[in-house]
Amino acid sequence: MGQETEISKRYQVAKERYQAIGVDTEKALKTLKDIKISMHCWQGDDVKGFLNPDGELTGGIMATGNYPGAAHTPKQLRQDLEKAYSLIPGKHKLNLHAIYVDTDEKVDLNEIEPKHFTPWVEWAKEQGLGLDFNPTFFSHPMFKDNYTLASPDKEVRDFWIEHGKRSRKISEYFGKELGQTSINNFWVPDGIKDCPIDRYTPRKRLMEALDEVFAEKLDEKYTQEAVESKLFGLGAEAYTVGSHEFYMGYGITRDKLICLDAGHFHPTEVISNKLSSLALFSKGVMLHVSRPVRWDSDHVVIMDDELIEIGRELVRNDLLGITNIGLDFFDATINRIAAWVVGTRNTQKSLLKALLEPTADLKKMELENDFTSRMAITEELKDFPFGDVWNYFCEINGVPVGLDWLKEVKAYEEDVLLKR
């Protein structure tokens, strides 16, 4: 009780300090509580899935490390996810890939149906979570010569077109059952290792294949689709068919959400700078918040400059209503539950930091060319008691404050993970 009282006291002091510059902390906390983060399932087992868990991870991505305790079954993964969600304030979503089927049937990617994900839906209902989805265009024998939907081989294309169509029905099923729109994100890793002669034709094939996948109109109350670009991957260093320009054009002309992954661009390029432009021309955005270290390494999200900028762009430009925030990282060198907790809580913190700015006043100063005040206030804000507001948010949402969550993760590791 003593700690709770101390947290509340510190919050009251922080509240008054923010109030003095025109910031309503209660409003900020209410807004933050309503923001759902789509936490990705694949951190829990290093992107192996349950369709062919012993198969090779392909698609130009890589999970490094061998930390003990990875989930090997859907039940174990759900148990780990429950632990992670219990340490994160608010109610959120889970982002599933197609390879995370939960069925005793022997089923291939072009055969999956909603029934193969029913245990996930029942669990999500119990936990009060929404579900997002992703067709899996990698780690499969039909990922041939680095191609799926853009393959010159019609048999290969047709296999993946069918997979894409079936993924849409699964996402629709999630939306209907859970009462929350399910975002179905299409990332296709097709590409070439060395300089291609023909960049145009594979892109035409990809466009036509996607058009076939999306031919049936589905109710967007239940499912919305996003398309995700990438600059390069391992084995596709010279050319990726689904580039940023390709998917920006495709998304805008086909009325799809555009997915921006923080690691899918040139190392000096940031997605925070793209959000305001896409907001003007696209129907909306799906974010994959990640941390690239010199390449698309999918490191756990930390409170770095880009994460802070993403939060600012979403809040300052009032883009939260058209943005779906998801995470995408997988680090097998650390405790996987800790990875989820650190990444998700940091994403929430970046949003709270932005919500605690006097945005309207700062915009007015900028409009009036009062750059002196703009700089002075934004710099002074760096020393404001943001941490006390965050700790209070954790307390009122019934999750551990400060590093207390780490004790729970360590205990869970000892009791559960190390016994697997």
Curated annotation (Swiss-Prot):
Biological processes per GO annotation: L-lyxose metabolic process; rhamnose catabolic process
Cofactor binding, note field: Binds 1 Mn(2+) ion per subunit.
Catalytic activity, reaction form: L-rhamnopyranose = L-rhamnulose
Top enzyme category: isomerase
GO MF, one annotated term: L-rhamnose isomerase activity
Main function: Catalyzes the interconversion of L-rhamnose and L-rhamnulose.
Protein name from the UniProt record: L-rhamnose isomerase
Gene name in the database record: rhaA
